[in-house]
From Swiss-Prot:
S-adenosyl-L-methionine binds at residues 57-58, 85-89, 115-119, 173, 191-192. Belongs to the methyltransferase TylF/MycF family. It catalyses: macrocin + S-adenosyl-L-methionine = tylosin + S-adenosyl-L-homocysteine + H(+). It holds the Pfam family TylF. O-methyltransferase that catalyzes the conversion of macrocin to tylosin, the ultimate step of tylosin antibiotic biosynthesis. Also able to mediate the conversion of lactenocin to desmycosin. The gene is tylF. The active site is at D65 (proton acceptor). The keyword S-adenosyl-L-methionine applies. It is an enzyme of class 2 (transferase). It comes from Streptomyces fradiae. Gene3D superfamilies: Vaccinia Virus protein VP39. This is Macrocin O-methyltransferase.
């Protein structure tokens, strides 16, 4: 008996997760922060707690599973809108999203790839105190963070997923988000780490999120990022339950 189309689709999606996170070839990690051993560690890779030297994403399998579920939900529930990730590194999560939407036959949904493509910005006196305290700019060289738009495009092309449904928004979020040509969103995935980057995206794009859509916050564990989320939600009176994905990420579903 031939496998069902749904079975073949699901096999492709599960394989794509393993490829973008590179749990197949097990590349080592950069030594930075609390990581002192460069050896591949499967537990750290699955939970997205290392800095891969080769893999196209560092969010790990648990957060890829969450992205899978959120995207599948909006497709199956008929929630209209596109997908955006703000802070994409090498593009792996966006590549996964494009592959999944393609596998579900979602020809009308765009994947928006938003990043400075320069790593974290240098801080100024006007930045939020929690951003100044953590100073993410120091990680740019330590974990090979800055990735050019050209490299991310090449990564999409390697998977055969660089098409007209993939659009790039290059620049700092404070500049690109207010005028972003995004009309409607079904899933927005925030991975800017800082208070400023998180707030810039929420302020500009949350109103474009369809009821039933998802907000995923990759770095909810970082105090600056978490405070931005709660400041924004308190200001708008958002009471939708925040669910933890793992030790780092969280999400909520927009009740409308």
């Amino acid at each position: 008996m031939a496998p069902s189309p749904d079975h073949a689709r699901d096999l492709y999606i599960e394989l794509l997760k393993k490829v973008v996170s590179n749990v197949i070839y097990e590349d080592p990690t950069h030594v930075a922060g609390m990581i002192t051993d460069a050896s591949f560690d499967r537990t750290s890779r699955e939970s997205g707690e290392d800095y891969p030297t080769v893999a196209h994403t560092m969010i790990g399998l648990k957060r890829l599973d969450n992205l899978h579920r959120c995207l599948a939900d909006v497709v199956e529930d008929g929630v209209p809108g596109d997908f955006i990730e703000t802070g994409v590194w090498r593009g792996g999560a966006c590549i996964f999203a494009r592959g999944l939407l393609n596998a579900y036959g979602q020809a009308d949904r765009t994947v928006w790839v938003a990043d400075s493509f320069q790593g974290f910005p240098e801080l100024t006196g006007s930045d939020h105190p929690l951003d100044v305290e953590i100073d993410l700019h120091q990680y740019n060289e330590a974990v090979d963070l800055p990735t050019s738009e050209e490299t991310v495009r090449e990564n999409f092309a390697r998977y055969g997923l660089l098409d007209d449904n993939v659009r790039f928004l290059a620049g700092w979020f404070k500049d690109t988000m207010p005028a972003a040509p995004v009309k409607q969103l079904a899933v927005m995935r925030l991975d800017g780490d800082s208070y400023g980057a998180t707030m810039d995206v929420l302020d500009s794009l949350y109103e474009r999120l369809s009821p039933g859509g998802y907000v995923i916050v990759d770095d909810y564990c970082i105090p600056a990022c978490r405070e931005a989320v709660h400041d924004f939600r308190d200001r708008l009176g958002i009471r939708d339950t925040i669910h933890r994905i793992d030790r780092q990420g969280a999400y909520w579903r927009h009740s409308g």
